[in-house]
Amino acid sequence: MLFRSVPNRALEAVMERYLHQFGLPDYSDEERAFAAELRATLTDDDLRNARLNAARTGGEAGYAWAEQLGDKLFMDEVAPYAVTRELLYGSTDVGDVSWVTPTAQCFAPCFTFGTPLHTWQLVAQGRTSIGHKGMFLAGKVMAATVLTLLTDSQALAGCREEFERVRAAQPYICPIPAGITPTKLAE
């Protein structure tokens, strides 16, 4: 049995606070020129799908926000946060982790808006200053979130209480049978 990711809304709220506090990266003229070159290789469907995915996770405000994106190369404001059942599905082991400990994820702008995942356009941006700025923002948000949990016992308790409530309603069953251990690849 495979498990979906279980969002922890209390933990998401802490992360969202830091996304707003730190703000989104500024981009140079050179970065914008590179982004425009990559954008020219994307299809209308790529952009439409990106807007739809961005909108779905922000509730009604998300749809209005996504429409305002227009042809912007980069998001210039943090997407609206909404408690929603809409999830962006992907191939990840975070789903299982989220059943073992409170887990939250954030999206940081590491690439030109509209870039599909698993494409050469995404890879081309990962080693650029565009990608590094987004990764640096994500790192700051994660670090500040952890610091909050280490220093604010009420925030930590809220995350834990929500996690225990969800787990009580639907217990986690590990898909790996008990007693299975990793084997050595080589001697």
Language-model features, listed with the residues they occupy:
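Metal-dependent amide/peptide-bond hydrolase catalytic core
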Residues: 1-187
